[in-house]
Amino acid sequence: MSADVNPPIAEAFEPDLLDSLADTVLGYGVKALLVKLGQRGIYLRTAAGEVWQKGGRGLEGLDDHWHDRALWAPAYRVVPNGTTGAGDAAIAGFLASILQGAVPETALKMAAAAGAACVEAETAITGLTDWDELWARIQRGWDSHPLDLQLYGWDWVEGQGLWEKSA
């Protein structure tokens, strides 16, 4: 049996590589970097407070909960039907959460949920789900994939159902 020389790109991303990528991207003035990683979940890194002072449409109401954060949410388990539109759905779930004034933990879980709902649907359009319906599914204990990585310097936040990088 030969090794897979072309693994899916999401499997190539290790936590240290993501941190390095995030440092570079945030260095360009980006306020929030969201990286969808398939079954490995979804990664969020946000800029320090001074970058947030510059504002930006839709971001005015975000408080210091959004400053200088590194979060990683697991992918929710679904029976997959296709991945078309899953990334777009995840971004839409994230942005909808921001517009509703959600904290980063909620926005990240909603991004993972919206992407998962799209993957389990027959088409990208039928995977579009109401925000309240997705949140209720998360609250009911939607099962997630275990992360097959060692996250050194990250802590599992039990009440939130995600990992946060230690300061």
Predicted region positions:
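Conserved phosphate-binding/catalytic region of the ribokinase-like
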Residues: 3-167
